[in-house]
Amino acid sequence: MHNTPAAASPKTFDLTSTAFLIVAFLTGIAGALQTPTLSLFLTDEVHARPAMVGFFFTGSAVIGILVSQFLAGRSDKKGDRKKLIVFCCALGMLACVLFAWNRNYFILLFVGVFLSSFGSTANPQMFALAREHADRTGREAVMFSFILRAQVSLAWVIGPPLAYALAMGFSFTVMYLSAAVAFVVCGAMVWFFLPSMRKETALAIGTLEAPRRNRRDTLLLFAICTLMWGTNSLYIINMPLFIINELHLPEKLAGVMMGTAAGLEIPTMLIAGYFAKRLGKRLLMCIAVAAGFCFYAGMLVAHSPVVLLGLQLLNAIYIGILGGIGMLYFQDLMPGQAGSATTLYTNTIRVGWIIAGSLAGIAAEIWNYHAVFWFALVMIVATMACLSRIKDV
């Protein structure tokens, strides 16, 4: 696998960069086929109560953090990141097969989630490998990262509607087996087309214990991204059940809403990537938080499909900027620690799931699904407070 041709002739077809785009799309599809329907799967197929649904997401996030931090430490210190991604894809495929055929809550929680945690770690490891590839070949890392993020968003345009179509039209078994196929194809693409980039001595020094620079700002950014992703996780857990059980709207609307938001995220990410150096990452994050506040306020009062779909523009601005800027913000605050920075960012998503799982389960069990959006608004206000204290980079 070569790295030099891309730098020597950037205007010719670049097989490696194209492979990165396809792998980003496939890792996105694998997740987009599973996550949007998980709360509905647990409710309808596993017959879990709202509190148990929330606990499942919380437990999943805790296990995921332990797995991803362990893998990030090893990947930053030694070894071939490419082989690690293939290994993660293989375990992700096994997790999908287990979810396809098993309906025992505790087996899914402890065995299925353990396997799927490795599968989901393939995505941040791919982004870390892409950052190293961009740095070594002289590519503009910010825009390349945004293009990869756009591929994940494209997968989420297709994934949620397809997931609901497969689950409702056929079965959850068919849906999970489709995700397993995505992992198999992804692993094959990584093995045959992505570069092997051995760690040099200078890079092997990096550790995962803590950022070597900007520790206070990294901690603030961790809190900011955790709260923002937490609100998004509340939405993903709660929205399908809110749409179906409280608003009594068609099941497919939930998938269409997620797909619409993901489609609008693509131009949002690209525009944010273009303006990142001109406006600064902090200002863009402020714009995202403002859009998020308006979005969740709108979810409290919206009841018609047209309004719910219209609100997805605000959701796209919120998640589109967060999804692209957040990762780069961590990498800029932690130079020389690409794997740790990327995985630390990914763990804000997982910690967000921990918070969201607990809040969503308790709120739905005690009050209703509508009440969950009030918690999201409170979390966004806390995000604003943290954002006012972080420095720009």
Language model: regions and residue ranges:
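Helix-to-loop junctions at the C-terminal end of transmembrane segments
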Residues: 67-80, 167, 268-280, 364
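A late C-terminal transmembrane helix in Major Facilitator Superfamily
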Residues: 336-366
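Hydrophobic core of transmembrane alpha-helices in multi-pass small-molecule transporters
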Residues: 25, 106-123, 226, 307-321
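Helix-loop boundary and gating motifs at the non-cytosolic
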Residues: 7-61, 229-246, 254
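Structural signature of the two symmetry-related core transmembrane helices
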Residues: 83-97, 180, 283-298, 377
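Intracellular juxtamembrane helix-capping segments at the cytosolic ends
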Residues: 120-135, 321-334
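Central cavity-lining transmembrane alpha-helices of secondary-active solute carriers
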Residues: 55-73, 259-271
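C-terminal transmembrane helical hairpin of 12-TM major facilitator-type secondary transporters
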Residues: 282-326
